[in-house]
């Protein structure tokens, strides 16, 4: 597949310096909207963590303003670190992101175990500004740092039997204390069809806002699929498995009427308990219309030609 070429110029992505100058206003907006609590000792808008070198910066969010750092890192769903939105940032210190390896298995010609730092050396990361839409009807705009999942897939040489790719989160009740409670069947597993995994927009993220990925955001390696609801983005990945048959996935198994396997953002298919037609952007007061495929329909809709998206939600 041809490598994705964004039509947005690099200068349209918001520089971190500009973001820092307006952080007070935006942070107050986010806090008022969602009651955001900052991690203890943190100040609004102070990015932390080691800086990452990026090969290029591109905007695939239509020039929308990125959500402030303190909101992106302080308002999270990561049940392995707790079920409230503030738990992940409070508990992230227990997650040890180095050393870290990822096991590649299944229907590939080159199964192997890779160190996450070796992955970064193999595939120089780039910054991509993406919209993120949660199934809970809130959204953000996040400048991720990572590399195309398709680059890794090609290097691994899937066999002709490989139709799906599954991503498994770390299972460690000491590092991820939320796993001590049977909130979900652990470990967390998500999956994509092989053609979705090969789409140029699918990203394996190792950072955000030019910094290494914080624990609460899925350090050191997480999946980002911007046209799908956020729960498809497996965090703290330790295993990637190529499969002939569709695997079981965590939320789809736990509540299939509420969380579909495809989980494509679709304003015409409501969650059983709320509408998906509108969303609240973190930091904004009024709701906005939700876009089909989260605004990426032109790029990804052909993947689902002929598929009934109401039944295959």
From Swiss-Prot:
E.C. designation(s)? 1.8.5.-
The record lists the membrane-crossing segments as: none
- Name the coenzymes or cofactors required: Mo-molybdopterin
Q: Which residues are listed for Mo-molybdopterin binding in this entry?
A: 76, 79-80, 134, 169, 217, 222, 233-235
Catalysed reaction, written as an equation = L-methionyl-[protein] + a quinone + H2O = L-methionyl-(S)-S-oxide-[protein] + a quinol; L-methionyl-[protein] + a quinone + H2O = L-methionyl-(R)-S-oxide-[protein] + a quinol
| PROSITE patterns for the chain | TAT
For this entry, list what GO says about its biological process: protein repair
Give a yes or no for keyword Transferase in this entry.
no
Entry GO MF terms: metal ion binding; molybdopterin cofactor binding; oxidoreductase activity, acting on a sulfur group of donors, quinone or similar compound as acceptor
A single Gene Ontology CC annotation of this entry is: periplasmic space
| Cofactor annotation remark | Binds 1 Mo-molybdopterin (Mo-MPT) cofactor per subunit.
Q: Which Pfam families match?
A: Oxidored_molyb (PF00174)
Compartments (UniProt record): Periplasm
* Post-translational modification, as annotated: Predicted to be exported by the Tat system. The position of the signal peptide cleavage has not been experimentally proven.
Family according to the record: Belongs to the MsrP family.
Tell me, what does this protein do in biology? Answer: Part of the MsrPQ system that repairs oxidized periplasmic proteins containing methionine sulfoxide residues (Met-O), using respiratory chain electrons. Thus protects these proteins from oxidative-stress damage caused by reactive species of oxygen and chlorine generated by the host defense mechanisms. MsrPQ is essential for the maintenance of envelope integrity under bleach stress, rescuing a wide series of structurally unrelated periplasmic proteins from methionine oxidation.
- Read off the PANTHER family from this record: PROTEIN-METHIONINE-SULFOXIDE REDUCTASE, PROTEIN-METHIONINE-SULFOXIDE REDUCTASE CATALYTIC SUBUNIT MSRP
Could you tell me what this protein is called? Protein-methionine-sulfoxide reductase catalytic subunit MsrP
Species in which this protein is naturally found: Anaeromyxobacter dehalogenans (strain 2CP-1 / ATCC BAA-258)
């Amino acid at each position: 597949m041809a490598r994705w070429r964004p039509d947005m110029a690099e200068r349209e992505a918001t520089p971190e310096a500009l973001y820092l100058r307006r952080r007070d206003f935006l942070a107050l907006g986010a806090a008022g909207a969602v009651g955001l609590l900052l991690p203890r000792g943190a100040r609004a808008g102070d990015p932390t963590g080691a800086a990452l070198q990026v090969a290029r910066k591109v905007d695939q969010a239509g020039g929308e303003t990125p959500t402030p750092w303190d909101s992106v890192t302080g308002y999270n769903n990561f049940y392995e670190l707790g079920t409230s939105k503030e738990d992940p940032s409070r508990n992230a210190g227990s997650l040890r992101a180095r050393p870290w390896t990822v096991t590649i298995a299944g229907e590939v010609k080159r199964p192997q175990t890779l160190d996450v730092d070796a992955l970064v050396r193999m595939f120089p990361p780039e910054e991509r500004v993406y919209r993120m839409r949660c199934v809970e009807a809130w959204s953000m705009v996040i400048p991720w740092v990572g590399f195309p999942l398709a680059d890794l897939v090609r290097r691994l040489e899937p066999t002709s039997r490989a139709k799906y790719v599954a991503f498994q989160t770390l299972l460690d009740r000491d590092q991820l204390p939320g796993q001590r409670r049977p909130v979900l069947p652990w470990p967390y597993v998500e999956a994509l069809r092989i053609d979705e995994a090969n789409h140029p927009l699918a990203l394996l993220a190792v950072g955000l806002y030019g910094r290494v990925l914080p624990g609460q955001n899925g350090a050191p390696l997480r999946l980002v699929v911007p046209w799908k609801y956020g729960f498809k983005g497996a965090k703290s990945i330790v295993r990637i498995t190529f499969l002939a048959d569709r695997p079981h996935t965590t939320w789809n198994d736990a509540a299939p009427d509420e969380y579909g396997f495809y989980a494509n953002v679709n304003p015409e298919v409501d969650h059983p308990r709320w509408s998906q037609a509108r969303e609240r952007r973190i930091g904004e007061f009024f709701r906005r219309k939700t876009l089909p495929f989260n605004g990426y329909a032109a790029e990804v809709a052909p993947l689902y030609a002929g598929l009934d998206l109401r039944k295959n939600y």
